[in-house]
Curated annotation (Swiss-Prot):
Any GO MF annotation of the entry: rRNA binding
Similarity field: Belongs to the universal ribosomal protein uS17 family.
Lineage, broadest ranks: Bacteria, Bacillati, Actinomycetota, Actinomycetes, Mycobacteriales
GO cellular component: cytosolic small ribosomal subunit
Gene3D superfamilies named among the record's database cross-references: Nucleic acid-binding proteins (2.40.50.140)
InterPro entries per the UniProt record, alphabetical: NA-bd_OB-fold, Ribosomal_uS17, Ribosomal_uS17_bact/chlr, Ribosomal_uS17_CS
Any single Pfam family the record assigns to this protein: Ribosomal_S17
Listed name of the protein: Small ribosomal subunit protein uS17
Lineage: superkingdom: Bacteria
Keywords: Ribonucleoprotein, Ribosomal protein, RNA-binding, rRNA-binding
KW RNA-binding (keyword) present: yes
NCBIfam families noted in UniProt: PRK05610.1, uS17_bact
Length: 92
């Protein structure tokens, strides 16, 4: 085993999430609403929780209502930590 292989650390997978674009008014930035579903520990009811994140859209391809996939990345600004991977479904 070489020394390079011993010192190399495995990096974890980046988070990939799917959500809907709710705003595209900023330059090269979209706001994506993500839905998180969890089951209540005691009662078993499915609880829904929405969060909004800003994502980098270099070409400005995504529009409001589009379903998109975003990937976690290094901080690009104060609150932009995701980038657009692809558009899953265009809005009608």
């Amino acid at each position: 085993m070489s020394e390079a292989n011993v010192n190399k650390k495995e990096k974890g997978q980046k988070k990939v999430r799917t959500g809907y674009v709710v705003s595209d008014k900023m330059a090269k930035t979209i706001v994506v609403e993500l839905e998180d579903r969890k089951q209540h520990a005691l009662y078993g009811k499915i609880m829904r929780r929405n969060s909004r994140v800003k994502a980098h859209d270099e070409e400005g391809l995504a529009g409001v209502g589009d379903r998109v996939r975003i990937e976690e990345t290094r901080p690009l600004s104060k609150d932009k930590h995701f980038r657009l991977l692809d558009i899953v479904e265009k809005a009608r």
